[in-house]
Amino acid sequence: MKILLIGYGAMNQRVARLAEEKGHEIVGVIENTPKATTPYQQYQHIADVKDADVAIDFSNPNLLFPLLDEEFHLPLVVATTGEKEKLLNKLDELSQNIPVFFSANMSYGVHALTKILAAAVPLLDEFDIELTEAHHNKKVDAPSGTLEKLYDVIVSLKENVTPVYDRHELNEKRQPQDIGIHSIRGGTIVGEHEVLFAGTDETIQITHRAQSKDIFANGAIQAAERLVNKPNGFYTFDNL
């Protein structure tokens, strides 16, 4: 499989290493600014890339969105999470002409966590729910795209839910419809996501801990391996 990388930060550098270990070929990289240290052919426009089978994106909206406005002709795996609503609308439009895969978290374990959460919410309807995510001190966005995905699962199953980001500002007791959302930044934490169900005299915690960023890179490669054989459409872990 011949792969075009969109962005060449820490994540796509891992994708390149792991993909080549699997026997795939990196045919080029698209970056905002060409860098002498990038060890692959560099491009600025999708139309310039002639021999790729699939594109894998671990970049940011500033790089990705202008590319999506070009005539995108490759199956596309997207892991960018910024400006999510705008991104999903654009990917849905593109999926009429190419196969597109999107996930806010490329770990299959996190996908399993969303399924476990969907099963737990109806069973624990009277329990309070708090969501917490922790990441390294260089992560900019908060809360993480994965935590937003977990929140979306809850919203789809409970009515009149209210996200609470700063209880200090509220200065009032917790309301039944509140969903606490907490972000922690520190050190080199790869990624941790926890769902706390708090009931009377008992609590249940469901946690996913990423021990290496390789799980995200491998998830993107595995998605690409499947996507190249799919018809045009919008894909997630649910239907890939």
Curated annotation (Swiss-Prot):
Subcellular location: Cytoplasm
GO molecular function: 4-hydroxy-tetrahydrodipicolinate reductase; NAD binding; NADP binding; oxidoreductase activity, acting on CH or CH2 groups, NAD or NADP as acceptor
PROSITE patterns in alphabetical order: DAPB
Gene Ontology terms: biological process: diaminopimelate biosynthetic process; lysine biosynthetic process via diaminopimelate
Keyword NAD included in the entry's annotation: yes
A GO CC term assigned to this protein in UniProt: cytosol
Gene3D superfamilies: Dihydrodipicolinate Reductase, domain 2, NAD(P)-binding Rossmann-like Domain
Catalytic activity, EC: 1.17.1.8
Function: Catalyzes the conversion of 4-hydroxy-tetrahydrodipicolinate (HTPA) to tetrahydrodipicolinate.
Protein name as catalogued: 4-hydroxy-tetrahydrodipicolinate reductase
Gene source species: Staphylococcus aureus (strain MSSA476)
